[in-house]
Design a protein with these regions (language model features):
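N-terminal cap/lid segment of alpha/beta-hydrolase-fold proteins
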Residues: 1-7
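Conserved HGGG/HGGXW glycine-rich cap/lid loop of the alpha/beta-hydrolase fold
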Residues: 9-58
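Short, well-ordered alpha-helices that flank and scaffold nucleotide-derived cofactor binding pockets
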Residues: 34-37, 41, 73, 100-104
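Active-site loop/oxyanion-hole signature of alpha/beta-hydrolase fold enzymes
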Residues: 36-37, 46-86
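Conserved hydrolase catalytic core segment
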Residues: 81-107
Length: 107
């Protein structure tokens, strides 16, 4: 894990198994609010702003390894043991990086 982990801003909706949805490049958690509200009857939906996006901190470091480490830190801070994970575009690549590093944390 990198030593420059960012504490990510996130939005939370609903109750149920945890589902994290990651936005794409130049997006933010705002992009997924409508869908999160629809899914909130079945899931607890977490919408983080990835580093350098939305309300999360900014850094010169912007790579998938670092972004997946940021997500790992968020999941641990929230005390989530396992998550469902979805991502669009850049968020999809972050999700793949996370899945390769921590497959045991995914349903």
């Amino acid at each position: 894990m990198t030593t420059r982990v960012m504490k990510l801003f996130f939005r939370k909706y609903g109750n149920g198994p945890p589902l994290v949805i990651l936005h794409g490049l130049y997006g933010s958690s705002d992009n997924w609010v409508t869908i999160a509200k629809h899914l909130s009857d079945s899931f607890t939906v977490y919408l983080p702003d990835q580093r350098n996006h939305g309300q999360s901190p900014h850094s010169k470091i912007h790579d998938y390894d670092s972004m997946s480490d940021d997500l790992y830190e968020l999941v641990n801070d929230l005390k989530l043991k396992k998550i469902f994970l979805a991502g669009h575009s850049m968020g999809g690549k972050t999700a793949i990086s996370f899945a390769l590093k921590w497959p045991e944390m995914l349903f």
